[in-house]
């Protein structure tokens, strides 16, 4: 298994047709470049990706144009151009929440194949005018149009549980919405949909936000960055501010450790600062959390660079007085590497422990707008040709319905969606109909080895039984005996040949 990074730039304003703008899919651990996309550019936070591989898509909000470009895997150029009511500055994809009702009468253990045509549930976007749009991808219906902010929306994210949608804007406000209320088009009541929570703690525009991945909604945390040099942590369920970190420079982007051990913040002076969320108490030697209870913590300057990444401060353009700004951040799945992009179009992979750059990617001609990390299997390269052929033959079936410009009808009978229903897969089950534990455990062991194997060499060791070992030993013994007999015969022939030579002399 290999980790790959997808990154895209904002585009050069002088290049009106985006001829010099590209997006790349590159391996983190090797020199492989899996794909590139032409005429690919967007605003910061204006790109969303479903994944890497056949059947996956990339959505980009075209800067200063009322268009969304859709790229399909295996095709470099734009696959679809979807017109929208106005230009969007940020977008996000929301997957449908999994059902929580486990009925014992139903066969919940049945597995299904991955459909060729698959799309997320919703696409949400924010515009420069402060409006919030939500479309259903499988039908193209416009489910929500709302004046959310007084100024432009800069960032938008949805919770993994599908309960909340969070927007941040240039009006220094962060709004938490109940997603079910926003898209309830069949609710005929006259009540006005209001934000679940309005956060007005910041004094300057919000630049980025992120949420922790949790299956328990009570542990859902919100992390925000702002141009007022603050990073704030909120508890969404209790509607409370937990901690405020004050940084020496404006915070432009944020990402977090997969285990919620630390935050990584990109600053407008080219530095990436790590903020630990836990520390060891020097008196009790106990690991304690940092902050909480509305504490305000000032992050001092790191003179020894123990918590700072400085790779982006090195300028490539001489004579330019503008400081380099770290525009986007993300982190690898194991939390050992951080991927960062800056205003000069550079993307670096840095080791979190040593703070050193371990790899740099092909630079873009404009500031980086979006970075995402995904995984691909070991045989991914071998399947590229097959996937390309499949995409060409299945083009009509992979097209997304055009987005509507008016709100969807409140008549539920007019709601039509396009789905690809896959076939069932066979799995090893026991007498009770459940998957055999030994089979499940073996599959998990194989998945673990594939995740650890970051090279193209298959390092999985195959274990054979004792019967096979006995057969192999018996075969080896017979071969060894035959070799000994052949060796003795060869020595006898050499001696006879020597005797004949002596007689001739």
From Swiss-Prot:
**Keyword vocabulary terms for this entry:** Nucleus, Repeat, Ribosome biogenesis, rRNA processing, WD repeat
- Give TM regions: none
The record's annotation in Pfam families points to: WD40
Write out the ranges of the repeats annotated as WD. Answer: 106-145, 148-187, 201-244, 321-362
State any GO CC term: nuclear pre-replicative complex
Q: Mind telling me which Gene3D superfamilies this protein's record contains?
A: YVTN repeat-like/Quinoprotein amine dehydrogenase (2.130.10.10)
Q: Does the keyword Isomerase apply?
A: no
Q: Where in the cell is it found?
A: Nucleus
- Record keyword Repeat present: yes
Query: Family, per the entry?
Result: Belongs to the WD repeat IPI3/WDR18 family.
Give the protein name, as stated in the record: Pre-rRNA-processing protein IPI3
The organism of origin for this protein: Candida albicans (strain SC5314 / ATCC MYA-2876)
């Amino acid at each position: 298994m290999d980790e790959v990074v997808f990154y895209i730039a904002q585009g050069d304003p002088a290049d009106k047709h985006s001829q010099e703008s590209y997006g790349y899919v590159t391996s983190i651990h090797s020199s492989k470049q899996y794909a590139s996309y032409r005429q690919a550019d967007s605003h910061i936070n204006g790109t969303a990706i479903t994944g890497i591989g056949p059947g996956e898509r990339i959505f980009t909000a075209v800067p200063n144009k009322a268009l969304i470009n859709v790229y399909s895997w295996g095709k470099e150029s734009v696959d679809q151009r979807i017109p929208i009511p106005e230009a969007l500055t940020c977008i996000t994809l929301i997957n449908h929440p999994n059902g929580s009702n486990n009925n014992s009468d139903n066969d919940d253990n049945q597995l299904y194949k991955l459909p060729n045509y698959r799309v997320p549930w919703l696409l949400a976007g924010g515009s420069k005018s402060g409006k919030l749009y939500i479309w259903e991808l499988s039908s193209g219906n416009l489910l929500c149009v709302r004046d959310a902010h007084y100024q432009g929306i800069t960032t938008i994210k949805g919770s993994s549980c599908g309960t909340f949608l969070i927007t941040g804007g240039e009006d220094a406000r962060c709004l938490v919405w109940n997603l079910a209320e926003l898209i309830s088009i069949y609710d005929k009541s006259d009540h006005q949909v209001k934000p679940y929570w309005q956060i007005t703690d910041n004094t300057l525009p919000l630049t980025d936000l992120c949420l922790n991945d949790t299956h328990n909604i009570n542990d859902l945390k919100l992390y925000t960055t702002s141009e007022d040099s603050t990073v704030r942590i909120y508890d969404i369920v209790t509607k409370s501010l937990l901690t405020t970190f004050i940084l020496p420079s404006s915070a432009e982007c944020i990402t977090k450790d997969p285990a919620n051990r630390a935050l990584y913040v990109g600053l407008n002076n080219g530095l990436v600062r790590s903020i630990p969320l836990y520390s060891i108490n020097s008196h009790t030697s106990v690991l304690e959390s940092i902050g909480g209870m509305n504490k305000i913590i000032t992050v001092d300057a790191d003179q020894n660079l123990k918590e700072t990444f400085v790779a982006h401060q090195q300028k490539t353009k001489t004579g330019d007085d503008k400081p380099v700004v770290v525009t986007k951040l993300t982190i690898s799945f194991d939390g050992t590497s951080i991927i960062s992009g800056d205003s000069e179009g550079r993307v670096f992979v840095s080791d979190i422990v040593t703070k050193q750059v371990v790899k740099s990617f092909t630079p873009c001609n404009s500031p980086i707008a979006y970075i995402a990390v995904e995984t691909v299997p070991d045989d991914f390269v071998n399947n590229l040709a097959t996937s390309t052929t499949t995409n060409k033959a299945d083009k009509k079936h992979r097209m997304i319905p055009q987005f509507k410009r008016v709100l969807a009808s409140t008549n539920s009978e007019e709601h039509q969606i396009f789905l690809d229903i896959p076939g069932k897969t066979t799995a090893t089950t026991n007498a009770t109909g459940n998957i055999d534990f030994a089979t499940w455990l073996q599959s998990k062991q194989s998945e673990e080895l594939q995740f650890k194997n970051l090279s193209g060499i298959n390092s999985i060791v195959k274990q054979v039984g004792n019967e096979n070992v006995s057969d192999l030993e018996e075969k080896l013994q017979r071969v060894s005996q035959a070799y000994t007999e052949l060796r003795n015969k060869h020595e006898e022939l050499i001696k006879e040949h020597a005797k004949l030579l002596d007689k001739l002399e």
